[in-house]
Amino acid sequence: MGHSFYSCDWGTSNFRLRLVHLPSLEVTSELRTADGIDRLEGDDPGRFASYLVDRINELPGSEDQASEIPLWVSGMASSSIGWRELDYARLPFPLDGSGAIVAALGALTESRPCPVRLVSGLRSEDDVLRGEETEALGLLKLLGRTEEETLLILPGTHSKHLQAREGEISSLRTFMTGELYAILTQHSILRHTVEEPETLAGLEDAFVEGVRSGARDGLSGGLFAARTRQVLGGKEPRENGAYLSGLLLSAELEPAGNCGSDIFVAAAGVVGDMYRRAATELGIERLETVDERNLELSVPAGHALLEKNFQGEAS
């Protein structure tokens, strides 16, 4: 028999809430805000629950749901700046979700008594993540990659590389690609010469030059060229932005060329284009980008897997 649940992805700077129906995994409504965890200031421990109740009440269709349907929350809500700090689950991490640390927080409020299930993050001996564990569980399930050796790349401010094999995530590694781009273009001398491109159209040569520079000279050795390309070569800021993107992606992707796995990148649009083009230039043949539908369903699918396991059913 089908039932519904709320899927909440609550990051540092963004909030996303969806009403999901099982077993179809149909998202019947959703709501997004820029109210990340770090924006809910104050010492009142009830502020997180109050915020969630307000958002659930705004969610189309929520008034038709039973008041006790589960609410799954992942992301920074389980961090030291969040709702309740939870320890990280450890590698190896089973892809059926059975290794996840889930805290049952009880009813959200008296007026909205949804049972709250807070999901912790994941750690290795020297790296951590929060939120991406749920996304990875969902994506690998949707892609049918729960047994095959797979390198899953989750781009972002901090790009996460998760190695999966034989039904578990065995390693993780973080690349600060997005944050480095932001720092370099906003706070370094390169801010005067670089503009972020919205597309690779007409900029592929500059992007490829950046990828090749990274492979040849290394990241540090290729950075200043983003300035000299304009000062000496008269290149436009968008071209330099494409060059810098290629340089940074070269540094991120080059180690992946030796992993021996099929590689899946959770990105569409210009970001997906950049990963594919950089991989081609670096001779990485077994890289695919994830389609938009699976990207959209990744977190709800991860929560659905955890919900199934939480109820004690076979995964």
What residues fall within each predicted segment?
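Glycine-rich phosphate-binding loop plus the immediately following alpha-helix
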Residues: 38-40, 121-214
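Short beta-strand-loop/turn "lid" adjacent to the catalytic site in phosphate-handling enzymes
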Residues: 61-107, 112-129
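Short glycine-rich phosphate-binding loop at a beta-alpha junction
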Residues: 65-79, 156, 249, 260-269
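Short glycine-rich, Thr/Ser-proximal phosphate-binding strand/loop in the N-terminal lobe
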Residues: 5-47, 289, 293
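Glycine-rich phosphate-binding loops at beta-strand->alpha-helix junctions
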Residues: 14, 261-278, 296
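N-terminal phosphate-binding loop and adjacent alpha-helix
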Residues: 29-68, 78-81, 85, 190-193, ...
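Glycine-rich phosphate-binding/hydrolytic loop that grips phosphoryl groups
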Residues: 289-315
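Adenine-nucleotide phosphate-binding core of ATP-dependent small-molecule kinases
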Residues: 212-255
